[in-house]
A protein has these predicted regions:
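Metal-dependent de-N-acetylase/amidase catalytic core
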Residues: 1-114
Length: 114
């Protein structure tokens, strides 16, 4: 798992590029996917995040994710900020609707060897 190439955060772009280099086909890594980061990925206007892989989540998974993200006190903000409890749950519902489930997390396959 790595950041998306559509992420607007410079540090995230560096991590993405480093991951691509470190996981070249001869590295032994068979599956590489990117994830979206609220208030960072959606600003990639030249190259928007377009998921092609979804992972079904439960309501309990969403609660656990929000609880974990609350530890990043400088990142979480009140709604309507993208990194708010409400926005995180709303995105999970939207991604779920895209794949026929109540909640989901979205990813983009970069490389996968079968």
């Amino acid at each position: 798992f790595t950041h998306s190439d559509s992420d607007s955060n410079i540090d995230h772009k560096i991590v993405y590029n480093s991951t691509i280099i470190a996981t070249r086909p001869n590295s032994g890594v068979e599956h590489l996917v990117s994830y979206e980061v609220l208030s960072s990925t959606e600003w990639g206007f030249k190259n928007s995040f377009t998921p092609n892989l979804f992972y079904k989540l439960s309501k309990e998974d969403i609660k656990t994710k929000i609880e974990a993200l609350r530890h990043y006190t400088s990142e979480m903000q009140p709604f309507p900020h993208p990194r708010s409890d409400t926005a995180i749950e709303s995105l999970a519902q939207f991604r779920g609707a895209q794949c026929g489930h109540k909640y989901a997390e979205a990813f983009r396959t970069i490389r996968s060897f079968l």
